[in-house]
């Protein structure tokens, strides 16, 4: 597990133990809304600038492209920040049927949007110079660490409510400052000169389709939380969140291998090394199974003890953990099939899979959550991921 995941897990654990189910649920709902707004607000410019700068040879053209992406991202971030603030009351009261506290949390979390969008665009810009360390330092170490530390300070020196409101904004602002310094060091681009950036139509044209792909993935990730908030209450969301975060540990194994596996598979595909591709595919699945199985077994055999980490009031959410652990294990083992499709010339097929998964998951949540609550959301996730795994087995077999 990377440092960032450790810090995020500690954040969830301590917030659950100190703030309780209700406040954790409110934080989860506001976070889900903000993450979905963020992926729309980025306009796909993070991935777009990675491609454009990587292919550009002239340094000045690289700088102009980065300034253009930052300017468009900044404007978009401000626009979607205002939209989220304006919709905060409607979302909290009419969609989630919650108190004014959720309105406040959604509105204040919106202030982080321009900063997080700049962070992502800047981080991918540094990656385009074939330097991954700066992106990792800010997005995977500093941001989650500041989030954790700010939450602890807010809780002990202010209030439990401030611990779910302020840390997100502090983390975003400090992360933006740090990545801006790194970006200037590597590319010579000063973020204070962003007003000089020009509108790059080609960059935006390439980036927007990526945005829609990202939206599908983000919606699939947050559907359970959003729909639990719609059909139930923040306490149910608060019980569900730690179980989902814990089961997510299993998926980290998939992400770790996918980063190495993807480029290798793409290279073999270009060289038409079919037998080597088949061997690599089976080898990676074997390794993913080996490393993820112990986590899955632990969560399936000792779910009550695992949930006690978050406090006694989370104990009765252990069946949710068991179902989500099974779902995460299936995704970890068969998820590499999605990477295979992308790297072997079938990205549209993978996009179709994600679209089907979103539709299926939303439909199942509509049907199961009203009668089963958190278990309904977990069951919907299990069925969806099992279905996609089955589809990928067939597709990769061909």
Where are these regions (language model features)?
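Interfacial/gating helices of multi-pass transporter permease domains
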Residues: 14-35, 103-104, 166, 199-206, ...
